[in-house]
UniProtKB/Swiss-Prot annotation:
Keywords: Ribonucleoprotein, Ribosomal protein, RNA-binding, rRNA-binding, tRNA-binding. Belongs to the universal ribosomal protein uS13 family. This is Small ribosomal subunit protein uS13. One of its GO terms (cellular component) is cytosol. Part of the 30S ribosomal subunit. Forms a loose heterodimer with protein S19. Forms two bridges to the 50S subunit in the 70S ribosome. It comes from Dictyoglomus turgidum (strain DSM 6724 / Z-1310). GO terms for molecular function: rRNA binding; structural constituent of ribosome; tRNA binding. InterPro entries: Rbsml_uS13_C, Ribosomal_uS13, Ribosomal_uS13-like_H2TH, Ribosomal_uS13_bac-type, Ribosomal_uS13_CS. GO terms for biological process: translation. Gene3D superfamilies: 1.10.8.50, 30s ribosomal protein s13, domain 2.
Length: 124
């Protein structure tokens, strides 16, 4: 099992797919990394040599922001939006959709489970 950017890559998967287990690397970025390092995308992780693993590790560390650094940057960007009080920041703060989706119905992912509001009974 190869360890790159603090993530254990599954050894039975192809390198192209295994790299996507790292936060911040998708299929396209994975292909670019493999092309830059000259590693065969169809090779399994268990078949990689130490030299190839170190090439991949070096390429990712030097040219891409991944895992903790990327998560910190995203969180900082959201925090900045909230601090300046712009529309997007307010939507983040309230836990509502940020990109203009409708909220009259749907938007359950952002809003969470329904909070049922019932009528109070009159006391006798």
């Amino acid at each position: 099992m190869a360890r790159i950017a603090g993530v254990d890559l599954p050894s039975n998967k192809k390198v192209e797919i295994a790299l996507t287990y790292i936060y911040g690397i998708g299929r396209t970025t994975s292909k670019k990394i493999l092309q830059a390092t000259g590693v065969d995308p169809n090779k399994r992780v268990k078949d990689l040599t130490e030299e190839e693993i170190s090439k991949l590790r070096e390429e990712i560390e030097n040219n891409y922001k991944v895992e903790g650094d990327l998560r910190q940057e995203v969180a900082a960007n959201i925090r900045r939006l909230i601090e300046i009080g712009c529309y997007r920041g307010i939507r983040h703060k309230r836990g509502l959709p940020v990109r203009g989706q409708r909220t009259r119905c749907n938007a359950r992912t952002r809003k969470g489970p329904r909070k049922t509001v019932g009528a109070k009974r009159k006391e006798k």
